[in-house]
Amino acid sequence: MPIVYYILPQVWAWKPWRAKSIEQNCDYLCGILPFELEMYKNALAQKRALYVGHPLLDEITEFKSEALPYKTAPIAFMPGSRKSEIKRIFPIFAEAAKSLPNRKILILPEHFKKLDSQALNEIYGDEIKAFDISFEANKALLESGFAFICSGTATLQATLIGTPLVLGYKTRGIEVLIARAFVKLKHIGLANILYNALYSNAPHSKMRDGTQQIHTELIQSQLTAENLLKAFEEIDIESFSTKAQELRDYLKHGSAKQVAGILNEILDKQ
């Protein structure tokens, strides 16, 4: 039975030598990031490496063709999914929120649904009382005019919906040193990584120059309530919306149908 690898490891970010082993041990490589297939040149030449679309576009069907009035519309807050990062980042987000009169939506990870109010208070602190709670990220982002987001895939999620954002991230110093030693990317937000790749045509060299970005990133000491509010006030809504549409066009479509088609074709040959 052929081996199909769907959602490839991030060899473009670190440990690129893994690509050769993956090529040798898998029959088909299904990438969800357009640029990452360049890491698998042999499989690409043999048409065994395919871009199948991004799974977020299977669930995100709506895009704001016109941005909401972000200074009066609700504002979404996504301070992460791990308790440790929430405890580092949410207090800073909450401090910035105090200066904003907008309705505030705190988006909680789905695995927190089983937690009672006391458990949530232990994680988020008393500041949680100033927020409306939502477990439906896509819905909350769609109705929000702006978002304060921790990092990672959530930045792409907001961008594909068309919600302007600022990324804020803070972690332990030792983790930063390790990341800088092994990961050479300029950005940490997936939306920025993808947008930079779109204009550099390389997954592991030019894309690291960081010359293109969709949203501001505030990392470590840069992450303050003052800087978050500054990013909020200075957002260029029109520019963001244009870039968000470009990124959506770059990713093209969801991946479910394409992967299912590949699997059906393989099974038909067995």
Where are these regions (language model features)?
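Nucleotide-activated sugar donor-binding and catalytic core shared by glycosyltransferases
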Residues: M1-Q270
